[in-house]
Amino acid sequence: MISAEEALYQSCYCEENVYKLIEKIDDKNGIFAIIISNDCKMIPLWKQKAAKSINGHVLWDYHVIAIEKEKNGSKVYDLDSTLEWSCDFLEYWEKTMNLAEMAQRDTKFRRKFRVIPGENYISLLSSDRSHMLSKNGVYLKPPPEWPLINSHKPSNLMELIRMSEQIENTTVMDEPELFQLFSK
């Protein structure tokens, strides 16, 4: 795996950051892109750089991370996290998902996860960045300097975020299912 310093990063473009990370990895076996969202597009995540306080959370409409599944456990790669790069999955899960706090929240905030094998994510994701444009056609946040992702195909980011969508080579999981997959 590459270091955090080698990873390309642009704030508020997590789907592209993960794409660029996976793209740089020669052996994509065991690497997964994980899209986190829910029906109301409001997912609380803790230990995020965008949080207004140390113990606070961010309410994203979606977030994308990479997970590397290994024999001795899994590692999480989240460039927006305040946790270390290549964080142990169990630590990331405990501190970022914060299930104790989530138990006190409305069920509409429960997160779902679209799990996509790394190789599939590289060929599947297509983004024209239109979701980051204001009504006036101005970017809400500065776009990455690299070219659009798979711009020869129609943009499909919004479909990938909708957890009700059936998309080939992807699996939608709830919190217990994702935990079971990567906690071993």
Swiss-Prot record:
The reply on keyword Kinase is no
State the UniProt keywords alphabetically. Hydrolase
**In the UniProt record, which is one GO cellular component term?**
cytosol
The reaction(s) this protein catalyses = N-terminal L-glutaminyl-[protein] + H2O = N-terminal L-glutamyl-[protein] + NH4(+)
Pfam families under this entry? Nt_Gln_amidase
Q: Which domain of life is it from?
A: Eukaryota
> Which family is it part of?
Belongs to the NTAQ1 family.
The protein's name: Protein N-terminal glutamine amidohydrolase
> Could you tell me which species this protein originates from?
Caenorhabditis elegans
Taxonomic lineage is: Eukaryota, Metazoa, Ecdysozoa, Nematoda, Chromadorea
